[in-house]
Amino acid sequence: MEQTWRWYGPNDPVSLADVRQAGATGVVTALHHIPNGEVWSVEEILKRKAIVEDAGLVWSVVESVPIHEDIKTHTGNYEQWIANYQQTLRNLAQCGIRTVCYNFMPVLDWTRTDLEYVLPDGSKALRFDQIEFAAFEMHILKRPGAEADYTEEEIAQAAERFATMSDEDKARLTRNIIAGLPGAEEGYTLDQFRKHLELYKDIDKAKLRENFAVFLKAIIPVAEEVGVRMAVHPDDPPRPILGLPRIVSTIEDMQWMVDTVNSMANGFSMCTGSYGVRADYDLVDMIKQFGPRIYFTHLRSTMREDNPKTFHEAAHLNGDVDMYEVVKAIVEEEHRRKAEGKEDLIPMRPDHGHQMLDDLKKKTNPGYSAIGRLKGLAEVRGVELAIQRAFFSH
């Protein structure tokens, strides 16, 4: 695997020198300063590429070229935003950057309720608490009909939890959910959030798929023409939330994408931390089934709690994800490609890490502190080395 590291640009508290010392060779980044929907110019792409290469690294993957909400709702200037997206792909290809991670999650990107969940060893992790999320949705956001998405027990627990929250607890929970986590290009006030949810009141899963199909049919032929591989990131968590449909959550969703636009440019990011929160998924089977179309991997683990929809981000080699079998399946796919004469490695990043050691005293992007990811990258690197030596040393 190609060892990569997500970097949020010049304002990231983790420097490119840090990235190189961590042992990564590739950088995963994006032009976050360009508004959603606008074209990434060749000049801006080359400027960022030069910064990365001057540090002795390569820009391996774009994560992400964000998709304007008008495209998802099929309203407003969606045709112009699609045309802009096509041009951005052409410009990236012209600059030699050919793997693009993206997602089609409506309104919110990845979602957590607690950004400082303290683990038994004192380090901090990210957590999604189903009951706290229910309390937010029913008692703070007050979304009409929200009760239909929860069990009677969850509704009662959410009311009890809300009753014990201080004003600061409520404000913190609201910020965590709607203010925008790292990589999310949108943040909202509560009123703005309600208005954005309202835009989806008539959009169910079938309609969102229809809108996604329009996007794919416009984008994938351009990607194929210029040699760019699109790698869709799964929904996180991989299920409907807030009354919003989610359409990249299951194996069936993945197969739908392939059937809708059957091009090798239409591929996937295998995020084990997203798919892995569901006990009914076999990650190794997913990798084997869609291996030829996996162009990027996020490797981390999660731990489901008593409520199966509550989880926290575990250490990379612990939790519910069998990282050994996952890495083995990815390495096997790389060797399959090599046998076909394809020498390219699959970019891997350790995704999120725990906030630990000296990083506990620093301001960090949630999930993206340096030391926790350094640890995760080293652990996954060790797993891969052992697998390569044991099974592929010939």
UniProtKB/Swiss-Prot annotation:
Pathway: Carbohydrate metabolism; pentose and glucuronate interconversion. InterPro entries: Man_deHydtase, Xyl_isomerase-like_sf. The keyword Disulfide bond does not apply. It comes from the Bacteria. Belongs to the mannonate dehydratase family. Catalyzes the dehydration of D-mannonate. This is Mannonate dehydratase. The gene is uxuA.
